[in-house]
């Protein structure tokens, strides 16, 4: 398969001299014991935060709104109706969320060992949404009806017309589930998550990396994008883009970058909307790469290596109103091991600014999220 050759973009001081930082970066800690934050901002500049808390092997999912990114006096809402039905161990199978029509919050997560309801041949993929009052979440539901052996984390996207798309990789009923035979599946809702279709395959049986997560996002035009890691032949673990221009009915499959390894790296990826189009960030060989994947005005280009240290994982993206983008990731995290934050701000043309850094304090089983404030500055949540 053909891949775009990456451009090396190591971020050292000698490379950023002459760039004036415009957006500053601020930091916000999760509540005590919080892990695996997710952040999204709506049209009213309200920041929506999601995170895990409690026991890592039997965690809870929490949600909170921050008006214009400021601290809120409202207590967080627990998303999961069954206590301890989420899982933080592994840093891959936690909760993800999306904002749909009229700002409704949709959440999906891999179920813990005791999570219910449970399908016959798999851990559950659980879903809930904010109810019509906006004050609590509906009882959790399992979305798996026929696939087997859920492993790496599922994902979801939602658009402004009531469509919700939930994707995960799994085995096919009646066949032995090996990594090189796993497929990506999607279930769709056209009524704001009230009901979902039976899952259908998006990819062929050429594989998906078992313990790696996925990331999905819908743009303002209702196009749906998702990232997953393949497992072609059991060794070609390429970061792969799925893109749908027909509201999730069909998906084009585009490999972005190969990684030849016989073992699963337990990686995650990020998507973000910017003036340059849809942006993607992912891990390859312990480094973070970054590029537009649905560019405007014909812009494309090779993946850019942006990391400055070893063991880079778990990227997240945020873009402000000026078109500047913050890319944040972790360094040194691993199994039962926390690590550091690292970040780089890019200008509206995608060039690195002088705003970059590294900071300790990422907890075990965690990573960072980010959002842009109305004044253009960025906040990293960890």
What are these regions (language model features)?
Residues 6-8, 278:
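Short helix-onset patch at the extreme N-terminus, typifying the N->h transition
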Residues 9-10, 77:
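Compositionally biased, low-complexity segments
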Residues 23-382:
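Extracellular, repeat-based ectodomains that mediate carbohydrate processing or recognition
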Residues 10-20:
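Bacterial N-terminal signal peptides
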Residues 1-5:
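N-terminal secretory signal peptides that target proteins for export/translocation
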């Amino acid at each position: 398969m053909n891949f775009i050759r990456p451009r090396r973009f190591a971020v050292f001081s000698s490379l950023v001299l002459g760039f004036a930082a415009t957006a500053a970066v601020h930091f916000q800690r999760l509540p005590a014991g919080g892990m695996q934050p997710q952040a999204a901002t709506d049209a009213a500049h309200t920041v929506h935060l999601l995170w895990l808390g409690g026991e890592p092997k039997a965690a809870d999912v929490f949600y909170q709104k921050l008006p214009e990114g400021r601290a809120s006096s409202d207590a967080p809402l627990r998303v999961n109706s069954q206590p301890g039905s989420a899982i933080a161990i592994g840093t891959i199978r936690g909760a993800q969320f999306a904002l749909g029509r009229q700002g409704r919050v949709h959440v999906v997560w891999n179920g813990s060992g005791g999570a219910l309801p449970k399908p016959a041949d798999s851990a559950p993929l659980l879903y809930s949404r904010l109810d019509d009052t906006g004050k609590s979440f509906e009882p959790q539901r399992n979305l798996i009806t026929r696939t087997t052996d859920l492993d790496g984390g599922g994902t979801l996207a939602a658009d402004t017309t009531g469509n919700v798309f939930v994707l995960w990789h799994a085995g096919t009923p009646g066949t032995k589930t090996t990594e090189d035979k796993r497929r990506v599946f999607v279930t769709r809702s056209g009524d704001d998550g009230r009901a979902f279709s039976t899952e259908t395959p998006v990819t062929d049986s050429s594989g998906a990396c078992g313990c790696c997560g996925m990331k999905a996002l819908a743009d303002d035009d209702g196009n749906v994008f998702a990232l997953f890691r393949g497992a072609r032949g059991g060794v070609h673990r390429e970061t792969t883009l799925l893109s749908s221009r027909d509201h999730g009915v069909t998906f084009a499959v585009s490999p972005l970058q190969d990684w030849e390894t016989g073992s699963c790296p337990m990686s995650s990826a990020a998507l973000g909307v910017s003036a340059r189009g849809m942006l993607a960030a992912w891990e390859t060989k312990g480094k973070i790469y970054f590029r537009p994947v649905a560019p405007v005005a014909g812009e494309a280009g090779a993946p850019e290596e942006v990391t400055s240290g070893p063991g880079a994982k778990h990227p997240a993206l945020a873009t402000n109103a000026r078109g500047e983008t913050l890319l944040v990731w972790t360094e040194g995290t691993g199994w039962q091991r926390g690590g550091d934050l690292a970040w780089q701000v890019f200008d509206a043309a995608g060039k690195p600014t002088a705003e970059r850094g590294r900071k300790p304090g990422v907890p075990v089983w965690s990573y960072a999220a980010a959002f842009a404030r109305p004044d253009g500055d960025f906040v990293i949540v960890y």
